[in-house]
């Protein structure tokens, strides 16, 4: 799937045309302009028509003065298309329909409400309905509002996702993609202070960052996230990921992982994350930058994300990862590695993932974890991690602390960790 994005000034302008909700097609130029129905009437039939008629070598326009109501699911197949997406999309608040009719995703038992690609996008996921209904206990069926699935040569700019029910912006099988000026906000208006009702609302990610998975050659610049889970997650089989200028407000920081949850290669290689601000919000900011892999055996799980099935035992390499220039304001923890996800107490140090050539460089600020230990490295007895570098990681264990924090390490190769006091 190839996309050619051009600026608004070069698009034909349909000034003076009036619509009662529908699709206006310029046959000569293969351009479809979609007008919203209004009054919370489902706009999906018109969207489907536009994607069908102009989704192959054409242009689809969603004017900026339009508000679209997304009542049903959609997965158009597009080719060589330009999407000028200025209007606002709001997903319906029909929770029963969404739980039972979204597209299933095998990874962590999730679902997707809408799969497409576009440019200049504002999506309102109507997530507060979900946050209030579940009150911090995620249930199966919450849909991701937006997924790039099986795409290549994609450029996305000025993209805003408001109140996503689940992961905000995801890549599943994507190659050569560039994202710039992306904003994701998941804020519960009903949650009591100090309570996180917006868990699993990850920002950007490679699911296959923002979630990424099966993603190659991905660039993300100028990204802002406010929410209650991973700001950016880089998941299995993500390669050549470059991320710069990020602000994470609340949640769980920048994650590589989780990896190894399933019996498959879960490698991640060649990642740079640079110039990041980590800001505590609503007493919620768990990590700053971390790598997490599952234990090396199938372990019974009870959470909905595992669909009640045992998980773990995946393999692969996590290597050539650089986290640099982080300003940490009150996260519970500094940079860390944890290879014991999914452990029930009997499988510590059993991960089959090999972690190596990791650099945490130029971290400043303070943590709020209530301990002098600001960084932990817990790897694998099966494949002890090595070449883990802490270079100018200067974090204080509290806003008013006078001494720098220390670290702790286990299941690492002899001399495998450098620059972390206590290891």
Curated annotation (Swiss-Prot):
* Signal peptide start and end residues: 1-20
Query: Which GO-annotated molecular functions does the record name?
Result: galacturan 1,4-alpha-galacturonidase activity; polygalacturonase activity
Name the enzyme group at the top EC level.
hydrolase
- A Pfam family annotated for this UniProt entry: Glyco_hydro_28
Cross-referenced InterPro entries: Glyco_hydro_28 (IPR000743), Pectin_lyas_fold (IPR012334), Pectin_lyase_fold/virulence (IPR011050)
The protein's Enzyme Commission number:
3.2.1.67
Q: What's a GO cellular component annotated to this UniProt protein?
A: extracellular region
Catalyses which reaction(s): [(1->4)-alpha-D-galacturonosyl](n) + H2O = alpha-D-galacturonate + [(1->4)-alpha-D-galacturonosyl](n-1)
The annotated active site, in chain numbering, is: 229 (proton donor), 252
Q: Does the keyword Nucleotide-binding apply?
A: no
| Single GO BP term | polysaccharide catabolic process
Instruction: Give the UniProt subcellular location, in the record's own words.
Output: Secreted
Superkingdom is Eukaryota
S-S bonds: 231-248, 379-385, 409-423
**Mind listing the UniProt keywords for this protein, alphabetically?**
Carbohydrate metabolism, Cell wall biogenesis/degradation, Disulfide bond, Glycoprotein, Glycosidase, Hydrolase, Polysaccharide degradation, Secreted, Signal
The answer to keyword Glycoprotein applying to this record is yes
User: Which residues are reported to be glycosylated?
Assistant: 100, 120, 150, 173, 185, 245, 344, 362, 400
Family of this protein:
Belongs to the glycosyl hydrolase 28 family.
- Its biological purpose: Specific in hydrolyzing the terminal glycosidic bond of polygalacturonic acid and oligogalacturonates.
**Which protein, by its recorded name, is this?**
Putative galacturan 1,4-alpha-galacturonidase C
């Amino acid at each position: 799937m190839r996309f050619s994005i051009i600026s608004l000034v070069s698009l034909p302008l349909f000034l003076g045309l009036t619509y009662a909700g529908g699709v206006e097609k310029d046959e000569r130029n293969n351009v479809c302009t979609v007008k919203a129905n209004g009054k919370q009437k489902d706009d999906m039939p018109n969207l489907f028509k536009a994607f069908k008629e102009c989704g192959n070598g054409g242009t689809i326009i969603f004017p900026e003065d339009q508000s679209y109501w997304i009542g049903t699911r959609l997965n158009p197949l597009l080719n060589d298309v330009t999407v000028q997406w200025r209007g606002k999309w709001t997903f319906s608040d029909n929770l029963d329909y969404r739980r039972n009719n979204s597209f299933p995703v095998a990874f962590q038992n999730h679902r997707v409400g809408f799969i497409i690609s576009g440019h200049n996008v504002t999506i309102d996921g109507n997530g507060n309905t979900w946050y209030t209904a579940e009150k911090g206990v995620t249930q199966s069926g919450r849909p991701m509002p937006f997924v790039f699935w099986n795409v290549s040569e994609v450029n996305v700019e000025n993209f805003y996702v408001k109140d996503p029910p689940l992961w905000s912006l995801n890549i599943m099988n994507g190659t050569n993609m560039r994202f710039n000026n992306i904003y994701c906000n998941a804020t519960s208006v009903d949650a009591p202070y100090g309570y996180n009702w917006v868990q699993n609302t990850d920002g950007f990610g490679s699911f296959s960052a923002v979630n990424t998975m099966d993603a190659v050659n991905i660039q993300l610049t100028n990204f802002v996230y406010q929410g209650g889970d991973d700001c950016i997650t880089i998941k299995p089989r993500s390669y050549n990921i470059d991320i710069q200028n990020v602000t994470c407000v609340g949640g769980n920081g920048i994650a590589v992982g989780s990896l190894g949850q399933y019996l498959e290669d879960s490698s991640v290689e060649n990642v740079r994350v640079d110039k990041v601000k980590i800001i505590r919000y609503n007493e919620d900011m768990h990590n700053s930058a971390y790598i997490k892999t599952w234990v090396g055996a199938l372990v019974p799980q009870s959470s909905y994300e595992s669909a009640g099935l045992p998980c773990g035992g995946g393999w692969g390499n996590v290597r050539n990862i650089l986290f640099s220039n982080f300003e940490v304001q009150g996260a519970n923890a500094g940079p860390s590695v944890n290879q014991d996800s999914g452990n029930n107490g009997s499988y510590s140090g059993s991960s089959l993932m090999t972690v190596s050539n990791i650099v945490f460089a130029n971290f400043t600020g303070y943590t709020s974890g209530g301990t002098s230990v600001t960084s932990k490295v817990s790897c694998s007895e099966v494949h002890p991690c090595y070449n883990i570098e802490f270079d100018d990681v200067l974090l204080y264990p509290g806003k008013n602390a006078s001494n720098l924090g220390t670290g702790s390490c286990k299941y690492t190769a002899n001399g495998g960790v450098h620059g972390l006091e206590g290891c």
